[in-house]
């Protein structure tokens, strides 16, 4: 069962601030399990791709236009799972790492990590540690996140590959 709870001591108050100039816009394709981060161009439109990578999508992820509202370094998402670099969205979804068994870098759930690029039974929008950390550090409160069924991803945009890990590997390789 998802609790969505976090101790206030876990919340990084620095990340409550509004992103500088609302620099980024995040778009997620449900069909492609892909997240693309865009930045503003000279015409003040979000058209310049900055990052593109695969994500795992939880069972409740649905089309929505939302925004980052709060962040936590670690968040307990169920009775047995935690995620790191968690960015909560206004629609109650989360952008975060794959799941961990405890609040330890050495206790990754390898099955969750290897599911990046697919649907998963737990969590919201899961990604590698490096990508979750990038969003955590660069996309502040009120950064728009648009979740859509599908959109065309230009062939110019390189979507990062996922290197699968062994079933007994408990550390994110990124």
How should these model regions be labeled?
Residues 12-108:
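Gly/Pro-biased beta-strand-loop elements
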């Amino acid at each position: 069962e998802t609790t969505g709870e976090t101790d206030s001591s876990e919340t990084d108050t620095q990340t409550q601030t509004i992103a500088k100039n609302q620099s980024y816009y995040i778009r997620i394709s449900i069909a492609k399990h892909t997240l693309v981060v865009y930045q503003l161009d000279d015409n003040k439109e979000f058209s310049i791709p900055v990052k593109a990578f695969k994500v795992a999508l939880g069972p409740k992820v649905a089309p929505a236009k939302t925004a980052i509202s709060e962040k936590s370094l670690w968040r307990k998402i169920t009775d047995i799972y935690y995620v790191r670099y968690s960015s909560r969205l206004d629609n109650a979804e989360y952008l975060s790492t794959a799941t961990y068994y405890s609040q330890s870098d050495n206790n990754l759930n390898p099955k969750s990590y290897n599911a990046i690029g697919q649907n998963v039974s737990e969590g919201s929008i899961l990604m590698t540690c490096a990508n979750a950390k990038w969003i955590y550090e660069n996309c502040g409160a009120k950064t728009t996140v648009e979740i859509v069924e599908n959109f065309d991803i230009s062939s110019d945009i390189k979507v990062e590959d996922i290197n699968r890990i062994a079933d007994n590997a408990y550390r994110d390789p990124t």
